[in-house]
Structures are given as C-alpha cells and as structure tokens.
Amino acid sequence: MICCEIQQKSHKKNKPQPDDKSLLARFFHADRSLTAVASELDSFDGRAEPDRCSRLVSRLRQNQDKVLSITNLIMEELLGEDRDPRAFRAKFPEEVLQENLAGQLWFGAECLAAGSSIMNREVESKEMRPLAQAVTKSLGNVRVLLRDQCLRNNVPNSKTLHLDLNDYTTEQLYESLKIFDRLFAEFELSYVSAMVQVKSRHEYEMQQWIGVLFSETLQRALKIGLLDQDMVDAFDPGLMFSIPRLAIVAGLVVYAKGPLDMDMPGDQLSEMFRPFRTILIKIRDLLRNLNNQELYQLEKLLCTNEDINTKVPVGSSSIEAPTPEHSSTPTTSSNNNNNNKSSSSSSGTGSGSGAGTVERLVDQRNNNNNQQNSNESTTLPPRSPSMLSLSASSTPTASPAPSPTPSHSIASTTSSAASSNSTHPPADWSDGDDEDEDEEEDEEEDELEDTEDDTDEEQLLKDIVAADCASGYLIPNTNLGNLLQPQQVPLTDNFVASEDDDEYGTGDQQQEQPQQQGHRKEDEEEPSTSAALQRLRLASSDDSEPHRDQGETIKSTEEQEQQQQQQEQQTLQSSRQRHSHSHSHSHRHHHRHHHHHHHSTHQQQLQHQPHHHQPHPHRLTRSGRKRCSMEAAVEVEQQEQGLASGDTSAASSLSDDVSLAMRNTTARLKFNTENLLHRLFVCIAGVADQLQTNFASDLRQILRSVFLMNMSSVEEEQIEIPEKTKESELFEFRASENDVIQESAGSNQSIYSAEEVNPELDNVFSAGSRHSAGATMQRNNTIDNPSSSNTSSSSATTRNHVTRSRSLGDQETIARSMPAPVHQQEQEMQQQQDHQQQQHQHQVQVQLQRQRNNSVGSNTPSSASSTSSSSEQNSPVSTRSGSSRRRLQSNNETQMPSSTSTATAAATLAPPAWIPDGKAPRCMSCQTPFTAFRRRHHCRNCGGVFCGVCSNATAPLPKYGLTKAVRVCRDCYVREVQVRSSSTTTSVSVNVGVQMQSQAGRVQTATAS
C-alpha cells in the first residue's frame, strides 16, 4: 500500500508540463485531450444533440490524427528499419495519401469494430471487421504503455527518447509497437482498397506501357516536325493535350500491337482506355483509310488546331467517298482514266474550271432567293433533301450529330444513310417514312449495279455512323474553338451550292433561268431535333400536296418495288443517249424548282415519266441526283458507240454533263476528306481530353515521366566562382557611405544589403571630398606652418579622389601606391598625430610666453604692428588669396577652421570591404540563420554581415568620411566609442590651448590700441 502511494506520488512529480516539447510529453497531452473528447461523446445521446455530436466527432478525429502522428514518430525512432514496409502505397491515388489518413483509418477501424459497415461495401466490411478489432485493441495497449513511459522516463524538452533498455516495460513497449505497426499497415491496405480502386499488377504494367507509348509518340512527333524540343525542355502546357491525342493516333495505327491494341480482350486493356474501347475501334478503322499526307494533316491538326488544307486531286485520295449515293463515282472515274482517254481529258477540263462554276452557282443561288421570295404564296416549298436527311438522322434516340456521314453535313444529296440510322422514327412521320423507303429501294438498285464497291462504302459508312454517334457523349475540348463544334453545321449558300453542282449545266442553265419561278424559301434553315423536328417533317409532308393535285399519286410500297424492277430492266436495255439531256434537264428542274408555272412544265414532266416510272418529284429528285454522276460516266462509253446516230446538241450536252460530273467528283472527294479529318479530330480530342478529367492523377504521372525522359541531355554546367586573389576584386563598386547619405538627403536609415548602395560617377566621389573629415587627425597644426598645410591639403585631395574610385583597376592602383597595408598606415598616422600634438603643445607654450613678454616689456606701436604682421603672415587666408595685410585679427581667427578642415582630409581611408550576402548565410555574431524575414545588415566599420539585433547601434565614422551616424555592429561600436572618447579628450586640450591663444591675442590688441 505504501509502495503504491509512493509510486503515485513519483508519477505526479514526473508528470510532463504543458510547455514540454519532448515526444513523450507531446503524446501525453494529446492522449489526455483525446480521452476527454471521447468521454464527453459517451456522456450524452448524439441523436438528441446532433450539432454537438458532430462538433465532438470532428474534434475526436483531429485528436486521433494527432495521437497517431506522434506515435508514428516514436515508432520511427524506436523501431527504425524493423517497421513494416508500406510499398503498397505506390498503388494508391495521390488524393488518398493525405496527412490525416492515419486518423481516418483509426476512425474507420473503430466504426467497423463497433459493427458498422461501409456503404455499398458490406462484404468487404464483414471481412475487415476482425482485423479492425485487432487494430483497435493493439492501439489501446500501445497507448497505455506510452503513458506509463511518459511518467517514468520522460526527459523534459529532449529531442530523443531516453528509455531504460533494461526495463521490462520498455521491452514490452517495443514488441507492442511492432505488432501494432504490422496490423495497422495491413488494415490500411484493406481499407483503402475497399474505398477506392487500387491498381492491380497487370494495370500497373499496362500504365507503364502507356508511358512508353507516350514517349515513343513524342519522339516520333519531334522527328517528323510536329513538335519542337524547346517545347519539351520548357514543359509547354500545350503538350499536356497534344501528347495524349497523338498517342491515340500512334497507338492505333503506328504501334498497332502496343497497349492500344484493340484486338486484345477488353479486360486486358488498360482501365484508362477501357471505357472508350468501342469508339477507339471505329477511330482505328477510319485511320487505316488515310494516306500519309492525310494522317500528317490530322496529327498537325491535333497539335496546332490549324485549319485543314487538303489538296485532293481526282483519283489520288486513298479515302473513297463514304456516301452511298457516290459509291460508284471513284471507281467509275478510275476506270475512265484507265480505259478512256477522252474521259480523262474531260475530267481535267472540268476540274480546272470547278472553282469558278461554284462561285457562279452561289451568286445565282443568292439572286434566285432574292427575286422569287414573293412566289411562296403559290405553293409551300418543301424542305430540301439535305435538310430532310439531317432531320431523319436527328431522331430523338440518335446523337445530336448533324448527319451519319461526313458528306451529309456538307454535300449531302440523299437521306438513305439517315433512314438506316433512324431505326425507330415516330409514328406520325408517315410521308417521311415513305420517302425513306423509296430511297432504300434506290440504294438496292445501286447495289445491283456495283455490288463490291457499294459493300465497301456501306461498311465505311457504318464506321463513320458509329464514330459520329459515339462522339455524342464525348465532351470536346471547349478551348479549341469552332473546330470542336460539328454538331451544328449551318447550311449556307456555299454548302448548298456544293451539293447542287451536279444538277446545273453550263449552257442550258442560262437558257432556262427565266423560266424558273418556284423557288424554295428556306434553303438556309437550321436543322432541329425532338418536337420541333417532328413539326418540320410534318410540314414537309404537307408541302407535297400541290404536287399530288397535278395528277401524280404516291404508290404503295409493293407497287414501288415492281416499278423499281421494271426501271432496272429498262435502264439496262434502253439507250442512255436518247434521254441523257432531258434526264439532266429534269434533275435540274426538280431539285431547284419543284414545279413550274410555265405552260411547258406539264409537257416536261410527261416526257420524263416514261423513262423513270416515278410520278413523285421528291423521289425523282433524290434518286436521280443519287445516280447522276454514275449515269454521266456510263453515258460516256455509250455515247462513243452511238456517235453516228447522235445529233450535235446531244453531244454537246453530254460533254457538259461529263465535265460537270468529274468536277463534282473532285469537290466531293475534297469535302469528304476534310469532313472526315474534322470528325476524327473531334473523336480523338474528346477521348484524350476526358483522360485529363477521369484519370488526372495517372496521366500526370505518365506525362511527368515522359518529360523527364525526353528532355535535352545537356550536362548541367556547375558555375564555379574563381577564387579572388585580391580583396578589391570581390566587389563591383566602392561607394562611399557619406556620398550615399548625402544623395539621400542626409537620411541616417540603414541600408539592408550591399546591392542597395548605388554607385555614382567619379566626379561625384571627388566632389564629395569636401564632406570628408578625419576625426583622429588634429585640426590646428597649421598655425605656424602654412606651407605644410598646403602640402597636406593637396595630398589629401589626391588620396580622397583615388579612394572614391569604383573600378577594380583603381583599387589595384591604390594597393600599389600605398607603401604599407592599412593597419600600418593607421599606426604611422597615430604616431604622427601624437608627434603633432606634442609639437602643438610646445608651440602654444612658446607663443603664450612670447605674448606674456610682449605685454610686459614693450608697448610701442612697432611691436604691435610687427605682431599683427606676423599673425597675418601665419593666416592661410592671406596666403591663398594674396589680399592686403590690413586685416583685423578677428578675420584671421574666423578663417582658421577652414585651414583645419582642409588638413583633416588627409586622414580619410578607403571604406571597408563588404562581405557579399551569398557568403554569409548566418549572422557573424550570434550565428542565427537569415530568412526572408530576418534580413542581413552590413557593418559600415568592419564590413561584416549581422542580424538586426547584433547591428542595432549607430556611430559616425569620420575616418571613412562618414560624419553622420551609420549602422555598426556592437563590437565596432564599443571600439569607436573608446576611440571617440580618447579623441574627445585630446580635442578638449587643444581647444583649451586655442582659447588661451585667442585670449592672448585680444589682450595684445587691446594693449596696442
């Protein structure tokens, strides 16, 4: 009992104080605070007072984190290398590794041990519950042992632990810490793995391969000139976007067997690109159709966002037109180039004049729209085929892309692809569905004519449709301007004219222009979606009613299929020569003008009806325009076979149609290429930019490694400052402190660093000699020796001018001109001063004795005049100016200090050498390191660097020409005070002698008067 009381008293005696900074004391107070918060939480019902409970829980977690951090420091010191490894933290995301991670883990362990479960992680919580209970139990044991050590072996304010290694409790603490460290590390891995997604070994390796892909992509871009090495060395932020985009292209095309191999199973693909696997497959299929020039153009666009500038001649593009309506155009043109020389020449002629024709068509289109807007009351204009195709593709279930194919958004001439994309149209789009079915039949007819080419084009079309639809959920980079806004392409006159090039002739158009009256009004109307789109489609179906009134009826689907078969047979058997001109003529009329008020309109429609077997003008327009270029190319071969029976007008119109078809082919290839590159850019940029958001941490690590690997291998040159053999070479200037003070209006504020002292010109330094004064030199040694005064004055001026020089060469001259070092000069000057003082005292005594004799033994005027004459001869004013000798003695007495100030300039020394700031990281007196707030101060007497506390004294330094108080260190201040006191004593004695001399002079003057 007595032993327990003694032990308790000893524990109270060894209780750590609140201001104790040792580890054990800090743990003791943190643990007490945590215990108090936990006890308060247990003292009331948290559901009754939720606000108080939430505040206490927040304090509890803070205290838990504090206790664990101190415990971690104790384990670092006691366990050292015996601690459990935590290499698994490399798998954690960066946002998980926070300072309060330990507190979160402890709080989670207590919750799991109490029976709680992680939301949506019930299975993992059940598995971790035994481990959490073991962690909390082990931590409680460690806390008890550490509190006991705080009372036993705490050393106040000790930086290390002082435990008794022979004590049983110390050994028990050591083993408990090892167990807790192992359990806590295991729980950390389990808990974090359950809360966030931790990379597996395979995923870690895949991300390393992605880093290799990024590095190879960057090296390839540097090699072909897409990027510059300076951008890599400067860590250009633009590369953060360019490298992932280029890596997608390179991984799909250049390094096809790398980490972006789309042929591997989806579960083996990296998690970064796994969500984009479908769109990446479509992008890969489209990239394989690009030639080298177009691939380079796409990569340049991904790097610089410049405009696409592709020059695609006829037959030179490796990308076939992906639209079904032109499936046979590239093949036909190539066949014509190989088998028919006349077609080749026609193609060249047409392509040469294509630009001018497009401009004329745009102007004519604008004129027609302005002239005939008043005719809309006659009949309601139906929507254009391109608008219908856009509407068909913009179903409520489809993506907001303007069209499923690149050509639809720029030069669309049919809605067959749109009908294939819109698999679930609304029920009230009846007329639109009939038109879509008609165009599907036209597409089947084209497949019968050219099966292989059309099959390839349909496959490419599906790829583009998939890529376009997939780009709907991708968020493009909003910083890339209009290039990333393909969802709303305005149907301007340029776009409309480009799609109507194949429906205008060069000669017939001028003749038929006066007859065209029924123009459409809304050629430039924007496409819309959802309910507005349904109303537009319904309005389009209603606009076709006037055409039904002219004797044309819409046939059923079965009748249309029969007519299509009859049309196919008749097309293969009949002669194209007989109706080629009227066919193209009809297309022009039906596309631009759906009906005519002229009296010949009905005759033209009756003339076309036997050839096409299609009474509906809308279907006639789409199907005719769809096969226009193909028919024109076929007509070339048949025209050569029937030239003998053909007339001149038919031959000329056929030539126009051939040139127009070839010119249209060139334009379509160009627009298709640009639009395909544009869509590829949107898809690739969308995938790469989403990596910046969804996988920001992983992408940062990869890009950091890529930059470090590809930086310029320039060896870092270590700049070594050569040793200065001469003290004067350490400084760039020799500014006098007195000059600086005079320039700053006499301010005695301290200058914080040597760099703040501004050197002036040499003439300023030489002019500043008038401010110099020597405190240790006596000022009245020129009373009886004016010649020595002049000599010393000239030498002082010369020395003062030399010491004010700020160039290094002048300093070397000073060093060579001085016969001895500075301290030797000071000793010699001190000896000279002592000698002059003794000589001056002797002269004062002699003169006093002489004055005493004169006042007693001689009162004659001659003696008085001689005395006055002698006094005037000794005056430096009379010596310099050469004025008359009829001056009063008071004038001589007044001008004596001027000679004294000139003589004292000889004692001015060179200012001390300042130690550079970079050479003094600590105060030279108290050794306190300098910081951003503890600034450096130079002593003006010794040149050392001190802190503000050690250099808070001020004193004048006349020996350096500093007559006003400047900053000095404490040691120099003590020395200067001693020197000043000694010099003051000497000057007092000299002043007494001067006063006695002046009194004697006044007595002599009075006697003479």
Swiss-Prot record:
Residues 544-558 have a biased composition (Basic and acidic residues). It holds the Pfam family FYVE. Zn(2+) 2 binds at residues 939, 942, 969, 972. A zinc finger (FYVE-type) spans 917-977. Residues 430-458 have a biased composition (Acidic residues). Negative regulator of epidermal growth factor receptor (EGFR) signaling. This is Lateral signaling target protein 2 homolog.
